[in-house]
Amino acid sequence: MPSLEKITTTPALTFDALTAGAPGAPLVLLLHGFAESMHCWRAQVAALADAGYRAVAPGQRGYSPGARPNPNNTAEYHIDRLMDDAMAMVAACGYPDARFHLVGHDWGGSIAWALADRFPERLASLTVLSRPHPNAFNRALQLPDGEQARRSRHHTAFLEPDAADVVLADDARWLRERLAAAGVPPEAIELHLSVLGNREAMEAALAWYRARGAIRGPLGIIEVPTLYIWGDADDTVGRVAAEGTTDFVAAPYRFEALPGVGHFAADQAPDRVNELLLQHLAAHPA
């Protein structure tokens, strides 16, 4: 069973994390997105530990109360800081120089792509759920049909000054309905709300969007073995962006489209995600 641990990277930053598996075993770092939390990986953390890995799924900057700089200072939430956090947590877990496996969903996927671009020598494998390679995403955004732009319009809504109030109003009705409509089980929704269902956490989570940084910035060609998982019912990422990701990976690459699965695949289809993830990691050992 996963346990809740604290990971301190600097005197000012202590992250909550779901962990399982023996320290020193091959490391798998799992990065969540919005509007979920580290709890989206609970099934993967358990399965990875059972398979002999050390799995660490942190509550990232702003989501962990001990790692929540002032969200009004958006520089503290730039993607470079989020990348720094990930690498610092790897070191704090006892893997300062070792290669490790990286998994990301949504915003965590954006960080994962950027880390694979910057530190390919540190990664044994890359697995991304939902979020396509940024270059494929940008290309789809620019198409005249406007499909991907429509799917991404929530990014603009999250920049509004009252966005946190809107999302949390009426017992977080928007958030509950958003997750439920995407097939997230009720018990998982409550876990995510235990992290995000307060104004301090929500303002910090939305600061990621306000900082923007490299979420849409171009990256290089990825040279890390990559598994990309996309649900064909994902309302935030269209097929053009998803299928176009292959153009930006120059390493062993596997694209898996999950029929009927939405944006939150780890919560909606945990067994299938576990199966694909374990196959990928076994094929590319650290």
Model-predicted regions and their roles:
Residues 11-14, 25:
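Short acidic/polar mixed-charge low-complexity motifs
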Residues 273:
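Histidine-centered active-site loop/cap adjacent to the catalytic His
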